[in-house]
Amino acid sequence: MPEGFRCGMVAIVGRPNVGKSTLMNALVGQKVSITSRKAQTTRHRITGIQTTDDAQFVFVDTPGFQTRHATALNRSLNRAVTSTLTSVDAVLFVVEAGRYGPDDAKVLSLLPRETPVILIVNKVDRLDAYTRAEMVAVFLQEMAQVFPFKEIVPMSAKNRDDILRLLGIVRPYLPEGEPMYDPEALTDRSERFLAAEIVREKVFRWTGDELPYSSTVVVDKFETEGRLRRVFVTILVDRDAHKAMIIGAKGAKLKQISTEARMDMEKLFDGKVYLEVWVKVKSGWADNEAGLRAYGYE
């Protein structure tokens, strides 16, 4: 590695649905964290790795901090957020441009004062083009009074130039040192884990507002033979009615979920995928501490 090479961990935090996973995928240059317009899409800490000529960035995408429903699942998600903050070199605190409310403030109150915090003002591209510059300027002034941020970065996670600029801003906050991961690595998560996340993303996209939060995905079997993967998964739901919603009329919705998931897996794994998806009812799974640990939650 060249002299002055830097390597460190950077947490991406914020309230649900501010674009944390989209930002991480853009920073890594590959889809490693699932996205959805619905809140609570991310349920696990996902590590994304970006290695450049002079640095390795290890980004940790955390679940959005949950303040409204005191289930065992949401307690698990919040533990994932708070435990991450104790082990990183810098924090990217993500808010939506023009919007800062009680849920954002709750997350900000958890951030350690001794760790550099960089404010990411995301989704500036969604503001009205005629008033954008003025609105952003006012919002940045307001946010500068809220917390001693090391940097304040207005941007869009969908803009490649903004992403490159952000990497340059973050690099000085990483300690000098050897890379933690192979330069070709994109994530520390297994293909088995990523397969479950991809199926869960499709459930989020193809079902109503209530259902995603009462469902999870379990990989029953994951086999690799050359470039072929055989993946067998079960979608667990809370009620019979939810099972019917996922399956859809004559199995149409389940087929759509399965087809899109298989295509995403083939793109990510760079090979053919045989995918079988089943739906089962397991009442109360989201409020069972022992069961959640068995499904990989903290």
UniProtKB/Swiss-Prot annotation:
InterPro entries: G_ERA_dom, GTP-bd, GTPase_Era-like, KH_dom-like_a/b, KH_dom_type_2, KH_sf_prok-type, P-loop_NTPase, Small_GTP-bd. Residues 14-21 are annotated as: G1. Residues 6-176 form the Era-type G domain. PROSITE patterns: G_ERA, KH_TYPE_2. Pfam families: KH_2, MMR_HSR1. One of its GO terms (biological process) is ribosomal small subunit assembly. Residues 155-157 are annotated as: G5. It is a peripheral membrane protein. Residues 61-64 are annotated as: G3. Residues 122-125 are annotated as: G4. It is found in: Cytoplasm; Cell inner membrane. GO terms for cellular component: cytosol; plasma membrane. Keywords: Cell inner membrane, Cell membrane, Cytoplasm, GTP-binding, Membrane, Nucleotide-binding, Ribosome biogenesis, RNA-binding, rRNA-binding. GO terms for molecular function: GTP binding; GTPase activity; ribosomal small subunit binding; small ribosomal subunit rRNA binding. Residues 207-283 form the KH type-2 domain. It comes from the Bacteria. GTP binds at residues 14-21, 61-65, 122-125. Residues 40-44 are annotated as: G2. An essential GTPase that binds both GDP and GTP, with rapid nucleotide exchange. Plays a role in 16S rRNA processing and 30S ribosomal subunit biogenesis and possibly also in cell cycle regulation and energy metabolism. Monomer. Belongs to the TRAFAC class TrmE-Era-EngA-EngB-Septin-like GTPase superfamily. Era GTPase family. This is GTPase Era.
